[in-house]
Regions:
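Extracellular beta-sheet/turn segments enriched in Thr/Pro/Gly and aliphatic residues
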Residues: 37-42, 161-213
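Exposed aromatic-hydrophobic patches
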Residues: 103-109
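Beta-strand-rich structural segments
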Residues: 47-62
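A short, solvent-exposed loop/turn motif at the edges and junctions
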Residues: 110-153
Length: 213
């Protein structure tokens, strides 16, 4: 089922010492715009503001300068931009290039859980097996760097009710992270949304580890 829903790629075997992969899914768009370090994906959408930050590292823990992070997610209406004619083509899509420190950082809003399309063979399989069509909320990532294996993965919140029953079996233990609640006074400087946040926001910290190709 995970191969039918994420038709461009099944989950790959985990590289030794690297971050686990997960499903690509059918909603990735090539050519996403550059997302500066500290940039924002939420735009004018309402929702829980989240700062996603971390590093892109090699298996020894050294930062990988120039690595690219291609990120995308659903809008608050549970639709990807390619499913929703009311969204811009690259809504909630961006590509960030890290510097010599390997650090990435961007803001967005918390993605929501959604149902996979249930028409066609996927729906038939779900009906035959008695499974629901829900996926837990998640952020999608493709992480690339010269000389390293491409990583296609997802990162999930630890409090999602569908975490243990993902209909495409994409959840891996090391891909589950806590959305850490923060006060507005603690929002960092130097970000696109600095000085614009009122109320609580969340922090998600996650390091990606790539292995040599």
């Amino acid at each position: 089922l995970r191969c039918l829903v994420g038709s461009e790629m099944c989950i790959r075997d985990r590289p030794e010492e690297g971050t686990n992969s997960s499903v690509l899914g059918p909603f990735h768009i090539s050519g996403s715009p550059d997302l500066p370090i500290g940039g924002d994906l939420k735009g004018d959408w309402d929702g829980e503001v989240v700062l996603f930050k971390g590093r892109i590292l090699d298996a020894s823990g050294a930062p990988i300068a120039g690595a690219k992070l291609d990120v995308w997610q659903t809008a608050p209406n549970a639709l990807y931009s390619s499913q929703d004619p009311n969204q811009d083509t690259y809504s909630f899509h961006g590509v960030q290039t890290v510097g010599s420190d390997g650090i990435y950082a961007f803001t967005s809003i918390r993605p929501v859980a959604y149902t996979v399309p249930t028409d066609g063979p996927v729906g038939e399989i779900l009906n035959a097996t008695g499974r629901h069509p829900w996926r837990p909320s998640h952020m999608h990532y493709i992480v690339t760097a010269d000389g390293y294996r491409e990583l296609v993965t997802e990162v999930f919140p630890d409090d999602d009710p569908y975490l243990d029953q993902d209909t495409v079996f994409g959840v891996r233990e090391d891909l589950v992270m806590r959305y850490q609640p923060q006060d507005s006074d603690s929002f960092p400087d130097g970000l696109a949304l600095s000085g614009k946040i009122s109320g609580q926001w969340s922090l998600v910290e996650f390091d990606f580890v790539l292995t040599r190709g």
